Each structure stands twice: as structure tokens, then as C-alpha cells.
Amino acid sequence: MPRANEIKKGMVLNYNGKLLIVKDIDVQSPSARGAATLYKMRFADVRTGLKVEERFKGDDIVDTVTLTRRFVDFSYIDGNEYVFMDKEDYTPYIFTKDQIEDELLFIPEGGMPDMQVLTWDGQLLALELPQTVDLEIVETSPGIKGASASARNKPATLTTGLVVQVPEYLSAGEKIRIHIEEKRYMGRAD
């Protein structure tokens, strides 16, 4: 069984009789010598969907669960449900808007490549996205002539509604690459 410092986002833990999927991890390094590094983890309970927060020391042993990952394509929206199709056997996987509200900020209208669903014992757990996505800027203040790459940043609204900080020289209509986990601008899209 792994230690708490080996846990990554997207892993599933069996903790206190609950299946918890890791949504976010904050590492808190102590200032005193000899003190243990703390890992504050935010989870979603697989069965109830409730948000759970726990703290672990770096050397705490945790029980992880092995998941099945299947590549999917976004298919369609049916009311409050989002339907994804398995790329191999066309099995539909249905999520409610509440289950994937964080992920929806990164999924463009036509979907994106390399999306995966996580299942365990036939139970649908989560939707996992790739590390980056290319999105178009739909609204931002006009680009400033002569602005350099090291200039200040400004907020930009993307096609999915996500707002990120971008360099001043970018303008509406440009495609940019976003790091999904950190919700930050990485550069112009290819």
C-alpha cells in the first residue's frame, strides 16, 4: 500500500469504509525541523458525490483501489445528463452536470481527445481529462501594441466560460493551450 506522499489526483482511496476519489491535493511543508509534511486532500465520495476533506502525514499508509480506465468521446447532452461513448465498444457512460461540473470548464463543444472514464466493479466513478486543452479566447481587453511576452497579465474568458490570466498581447479569437490541473495559460495553441 502506498504512502500519502505518493497519492496523485484521480486516484481512489478506500478510507473509513468509503471510496474517495482524489480531486485536489495541497502540500503543507512545516517550518519547524522534524515536523512532518502534511497533505490536505479534497475528495469526492464515489457513492454519494459529497465533498470530503482529509489531512495525512507524508508517511501515513493509505489503501488505494485499482480502477479500470476506458477512452471515451463526448456524445450528447440530455437535459442535466452528459453522455460519453466508449471508443471501443460504444458503451454509453452517463454523468450528471453536478458530477462533472469542474471538468465541464475544459471540454469544448465538440469534445476533446484522450478523455477517460474511471470504473470500479462496473460502477462509474469519474471522468478524467488529459493534462492540456486548446481553447479559444472569446472575450478579453484588446491587445496592446508593443506588449512583450514578459508584460503583465489580464483576464480572458474562453469558449467554455473558464476565465484565466493571459499575457496582454493576446486578443479575442486566438487559440491558447491551458494546463487543466492548474487552470493556467501555457502558450499559444499549435
From Swiss-Prot:
Transmembrane segments: none
Signal peptide region: none
Superkingdom assignment: Bacteria
GO cellular component: cytosol
A Pfam family hit: Elong-fact-P_C
GO molecular-function terms, A-Z: translation elongation factor activity
Homology family: Belongs to the elongation factor P family.
Name the UniProt record assigns to this protein: Elongation factor P-like protein
